[in-house]
Amino acid sequence: MSGLPPLTIRLCGPRGFCAGVDRAIQIVLLALKKYSAPVYVRHEIVHNRYVVEGLQQRGAVFVEELDEIPEEHRNQPVVFSAHGVPKSVSEEARRYNLFYLDATCPLVSKVHKQAIRHQRHGRHVILIGHAGHPEVIGTMGQLEDGAVTLIETIEDALHYQPGDPDKLGFVTQTTLSVEDTAGILDVLQQRFPTLAAPAAESICYATTNRQDAVKAAAKGSDLFLIVGAPNSSNSRRLVEVAEKSGARQAILVQRADEINFENLKALSVVSLSAGASAPEIIIDEIISAFRARYNVTIELAETVVETERFLVSRELRDVILTSQDMAFVNGQANNAKNENQNTDMFTTKAE
């Protein structure tokens, strides 16, 4: 009989890698297998230092701009990150005669296409998103300067003065859920009744699913841990959702060693989730840290099962990626399901 205090860890599902992030990491690993190191990657492939450092150890070299690639390595492939890039970047790659692989999330690519479609129909494009985010920079860069207006807040929406209020269409940053954009959209649609919406399939399923799972698990949680990087938009938002949905405390952490166990108040239930760019191996690490201090029971708090998969670039489909290749991020896949003891189901329902 363990002398450790009891603790329930409520493990959210879905959590962590979405299909777009998984695909982007696979593209880098497959390129390393097929073409050997170095493989250059423009910008962080996903917003997670653990993932970036793991890929660096395997031969990936990260740059912010293409002109940072040494001339003697310009015969090596370069990968564009999952966030997408402006058209000017692929044009620059062609000028340098670079062989590039585009790891842009297919859902982000759909947003790009929708923005272009709006323009072809004579509409000015409104982009709801966060200034400076790589995805926003990439989407705005699909069209010429002045063709896209960024709206970040309800106040922006209230004060926006378009050239022609009857010829507007909107798209959104994929890491914002329908709920995140609802207030801004309400204002825009009231002011501009003919505002054209994007096609339904351009909405990111993963952002909404992770927020719904956090909402469902938050009530009754003494502590809600979200695994993610400070520069991960969707991870920071999960912390806000946990706080608003009833968790006593919510914290963003990148690794288990960031948890200050000494300062934590008495714990009975800890809920655990991860942003779309956070690897499962960190979930394993955090659970192990709690097991060293508590007699842990795992509850699976699953709201939906995700089955989406995106194909990698055509050039890489002849290369085989093994589970061992992905072990540095995937850890013990489906951690709690592999446990033969101390595992229960927590019935969840997103409000």
UniProtKB/Swiss-Prot annotation:
<dbReference type="GO" id="GO:0046872">
    <property type="term" value="F:metal ion binding"/>
</dbReference>
<feature type="binding site">
    <location>
        <position position="277"/>
    </location>
    <ligand>
        <name>isopentenyl diphosphate</name>
    </ligand>
</feature>
<feature type="binding site">
    <location>
        <position position="232"/>
    </location>
    <ligand>
        <name>dimethylallyl diphosphate</name>
    </ligand>
</feature>
<feature type="binding site">
    <location>
        <position position="47"/>
    </location>
    <ligand>
        <name>isopentenyl diphosphate</name>
    </ligand>
</feature>
<feature type="binding site">
    <location>
        <position position="47"/>
    </location>
    <ligand>
        <name>(2E)-4-hydroxy-3-methylbut-2-enyl diphosphate</name>
    </ligand>
</feature>
<feature type="binding site">
    <location>
        <position position="233"/>
    </location>
    <ligand>
        <name>(2E)-4-hydroxy-3-methylbut-2-enyl diphosphate</name>
    </ligand>
</feature>
<dbReference type="GO" id="GO:0016114">
    <property type="term" value="P:terpenoid biosynthetic process"/>
</dbReference>
<comment type="function">
    <text>Catalyzes the conversion of 1-hydroxy-2-methyl-2-(E)-butenyl 4-diphosphate (HMBPP) into a mixture of isopentenyl diphosphate (IPP) and dimethylallyl diphosphate (DMAPP). Acts in the terminal step of the DOXP/MEP pathway for isoprenoid precursor biosynthesis.</text>
</comment>
<dbReference type="GO" id="GO:0019288">
    <property type="term" value="P:isopentenyl diphosphate biosynthetic process, methylerythritol 4-phosphate pathway"/>
</dbReference>
<dbReference type="GO" id="GO:0051745">
    <property type="term" value="F:4-hydroxy-3-methylbut-2-enyl diphosphate reductase activity"/>
</dbReference>
<feature type="binding site">
    <location>
        <position position="47"/>
    </location>
    <ligand>
        <name>dimethylallyl diphosphate</name>
    </ligand>
</feature>
<feature type="binding site">
    <location>
        <position position="83"/>
    </location>
    <ligand>
        <name>dimethylallyl diphosphate</name>
    </ligand>
</feature>
<keyword id="KW-0479">Metal-binding</keyword>
<feature type="binding site">
    <location>
        <position position="133"/>
    </location>
    <ligand>
        <name>dimethylallyl diphosphate</name>
    </ligand>
</feature>
<dbReference type="GO" id="GO:0051539">
    <property type="term" value="F:4 iron, 4 sulfur cluster binding"/>
</dbReference>
<keyword id="KW-0411">Iron-sulfur</keyword>
<feature type="binding site">
    <location>
        <position position="233"/>
    </location>
    <ligand>
        <name>isopentenyl diphosphate</name>
    </ligand>
</feature>
<feature type="binding site">
    <location>
        <position position="133"/>
    </location>
    <ligand>
        <name>(2E)-4-hydroxy-3-methylbut-2-enyl diphosphate</name>
    </ligand>
</feature>
<feature type="binding site">
    <location>
        <position position="277"/>
    </location>
    <ligand>
        <name>dimethylallyl diphosphate</name>
    </ligand>
</feature>
<feature type="binding site">
    <location>
        <position position="174"/>
    </location>
    <ligand>
        <name>(2E)-4-hydroxy-3-methylbut-2-enyl diphosphate</name>
    </ligand>
</feature>
<keyword id="KW-0004">4Fe-4S</keyword>
<feature type="binding site">
    <location>
        <position position="83"/>
    </location>
    <ligand>
        <name>isopentenyl diphosphate</name>
    </ligand>
</feature>
<dbReference type="Pfam" id="PF02401">
    <property type="entry name" value="LYTB"/>
</dbReference>
<feature type="binding site">
    <location>
        <position position="232"/>
    </location>
    <ligand>
        <name>(2E)-4-hydroxy-3-methylbut-2-enyl diphosphate</name>
    </ligand>
</feature>
<feature type="binding site">
    <location>
        <position position="18"/>
    </location>
    <ligand>
        <name>[4Fe-4S] cluster</name>
    </ligand>
</feature>
<dbReference type="GO" id="GO:0050992">
    <property type="term" value="P:dimethylallyl diphosphate biosynthetic process"/>
</dbReference>
<comment type="similarity">
    <text>Belongs to the IspH family.</text>
</comment>
<feature type="binding site">
    <location>
        <position position="105"/>
    </location>
    <ligand>
        <name>[4Fe-4S] cluster</name>
    </ligand>
</feature>
<feature type="binding site">
    <location>
        <position position="234"/>
    </location>
    <ligand>
        <name>(2E)-4-hydroxy-3-methylbut-2-enyl diphosphate</name>
    </ligand>
</feature>
<protein>
    <recommendedName>
        <fullName>4-hydroxy-3-methylbut-2-enyl diphosphate reductase</fullName>
        <ecNumber>1.17.7.4</ecNumber>
    </recommendedName>
</protein>
<feature type="binding site">
    <location>
        <position position="204"/>
    </location>
    <ligand>
        <name>[4Fe-4S] cluster</name>
    </ligand>
</feature>
<feature type="active site" description="Proton donor">
    <location>
        <position position="135"/>
    </location>
</feature>
<comment type="pathway">
    <text>Isoprenoid biosynthesis; isopentenyl diphosphate biosynthesis via DXP pathway; isopentenyl diphosphate from 1-deoxy-D-xylulose 5-phosphate: step 6/6.</text>
</comment>
<dbReference type="InterPro" id="IPR003451">
    <property type="entry name" value="LytB/IspH"/>
</dbReference>
<feature type="binding site">
    <location>
        <position position="233"/>
    </location>
    <ligand>
        <name>dimethylallyl diphosphate</name>
    </ligand>
</feature>
<keyword id="KW-0414">Isoprene biosynthesis</keyword>
<feature type="binding site">
    <location>
        <position position="83"/>
    </location>
    <ligand>
        <name>(2E)-4-hydroxy-3-methylbut-2-enyl diphosphate</name>
    </ligand>
</feature>
<feature type="binding site">
    <location>
        <position position="133"/>
    </location>
    <ligand>
        <name>isopentenyl diphosphate</name>
    </ligand>
</feature>
<feature type="binding site">
    <location>
        <position position="234"/>
    </location>
    <ligand>
        <name>isopentenyl diphosphate</name>
    </ligand>
</feature>
<comment type="pathway">
    <text>Isoprenoid biosynthesis; dimethylallyl diphosphate biosynthesis; dimethylallyl diphosphate from (2E)-4-hydroxy-3-methylbutenyl diphosphate: step 1/1.</text>
</comment>
<feature type="binding site">
    <location>
        <position position="234"/>
    </location>
    <ligand>
        <name>dimethylallyl diphosphate</name>
    </ligand>
</feature>
<keyword id="KW-0408">Iron</keyword>
